[in-house]
Amino acid sequence: MRSFILKTCAFFKESQVETANVQRQLLRHTLATMAYRSAKSVRDAPESFGSFSSGDKGRTPAQILAHMGDLMDWGLSIAKGAQAWHDSTPLPWSQEVERYFAAVKAFDDYLAGDGPLAASPEKLFQGPIADALNHTGQINMLRRMAGCPVRSENYYRADISAGCVGADQSKPGREF
């Protein structure tokens, strides 16, 4: 009986580890999806786009991208168990783009490692990741309003894979 119990406990522990790995991989794929979409959002945008104003009280694209970078830094700090929020002052557009993708990479690198997650994958997704993904759409909308629209794409066909989180992404599968 003792042997059966030990084997059962080992199975469940292994099953829990497997589930945790699947969840981490899904988070990493979500970051890669966000990186793909946001790379498309910022690609070929003129430097002046960062300060574009829609005329209302909304944020500029540079302010949104700075916030997205802050969200990635925050997500990493939550994952490491030392939650810290910083409200960054936006850099010039091209520098802000670099900062954002560096923050996404740092978060992804941590998720790719074997360090413990101090928060559940669900909380990491529903907080910083989902928020940043939402802001990607805002940048797309502002691109159209600024007269430099982003072409639509069938994202289902996009070549997206975990770990590919930089500004250099694969070519679109099908734009329209």
PLM feature spans:
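Short, contiguous alpha-helical
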Residues: 12, 18, 24, 28-42, ...
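Extracellular-facing binding/remodeling surfaces
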Residues: 43-49, 106-110
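Helix-adjacent hinge/juxtasegments
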Residues: 82-110
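Surface-exposed, polar/charged faces of alpha-helical domains
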Residues: 113-116
